[in-house]
Regions:
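Non-catalytic regulatory/interaction regions at protein termini and inter-domain linkers
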Residues: 1-20, 50, 65, 73, ...
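Membrane-water interface at transmembrane helix exits
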Residues: 69, 92, 172-180, 184
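Amphipathic alpha-helical coiled-coil "transmission" helices that mediate dimerization
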Residues: 174, 181-211
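Hydrophobic transmembrane alpha-helices
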Residues: 34-38, 79-102, 114, 119-173
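Hydrophobic transmembrane alpha-helices and their membrane-interface boundaries in multi-pass
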Residues: 21-112, 129-134
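Perimembrane helix-loop junctions in membrane proteins
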Residues: 42-45, 140-147, 180-188
Length: 211
């Protein structure tokens, strides 16, 4: 018995964004992006831990891509944004806190989650990113993290980061909803055009019979 393709987890009407084929493409692009970043970081040879984390994320991404290509897309949809959130948070915590460039990866993860899991996925990972930012910021302020920036980090930084994460999710929701509406309008127009063509052929046939 043939296995059915996995059901998209996205919100209703956004299946065109989260089909298994689209998931495969997104995961491939994500793997390439992580490989480029890992190569760039590895060239400096001063942050081997980050390279190792990225390599682990790439391996998970590859496994998710293989499964998605075989119709099992759910693991890739969940694991890839999940491990990227953990990776970005861990690197930021150990290397420079909220001022590390890794924090810029959180909005990317939110967008990725939105594409893979739908609107709810983007808000879910915006929440995860906000929690990670709160932990990192708290560790910075209290001198807990290895590279504490207590003299620079404040609770307002945590609030700003969380706000930006949720704004990213909201903007993504607006874009997805608008794209979904456009696709639905195009499909409705196509169906109306097809119905009109059928009626036209029917009338043409009746006219030919009368003649």
């Amino acid at each position: 018995m043939n296995s059915k393709p996995s059901t998209p987890v996205a919100t209703k009407g956004s299946n065109f964004l989260t089909s298994d084929k689209m998931v495969v493409n997104i995961l491939i692009v994500t793997a390439i992006g992580m490989a480029v970043i890992a190569a760039a970081v590895g060239a400096g040879r001063d942050n081997p831990l980050t390279v190792q984390i990225l390599i682990g994320a790439i391996l998970v991404d590859i496994v998710g891509t293989i499964l998605a290509a075989r119709g099992i897309a759910l693991p890739g949809r969940i694991l890839v944004p999940g491990i990227l959130t953990i990776a970005a948070g861990f690197v930021a915590y150990t290397r420079g806190g909220l001022y590390h460039i890794a924090v810029a990866g959180f909005p990317v993860v939110i967008v990725l989650a939105g594409l893979l899991l739908g609107v709810r996925g983007s808000f879910l990972f915006a929440t995860f990113a906000s929690i990670a930012a709160a932990i990192i910021g708290y560790a910075d302020i209290n001198g807990i993290s290895p590279f504490s920036q207590s003299s620079r980090t404040g609770y307002d930084d945590i609030a700003v980061a969380a706000t930006l994460f949720f704004v990213t999710a909201i903007v993504l929701r607006v874009i997805i909803v608008r794209l979904t509406e456009s696709v639905q309008e195009a499909e409705a127009f196509g169906q109306a055009q097809e119905t009109a063509n059928v009626e036209l052929k029917k009338l043409q046939g009746e006219l030919e019979q009368r003649v």
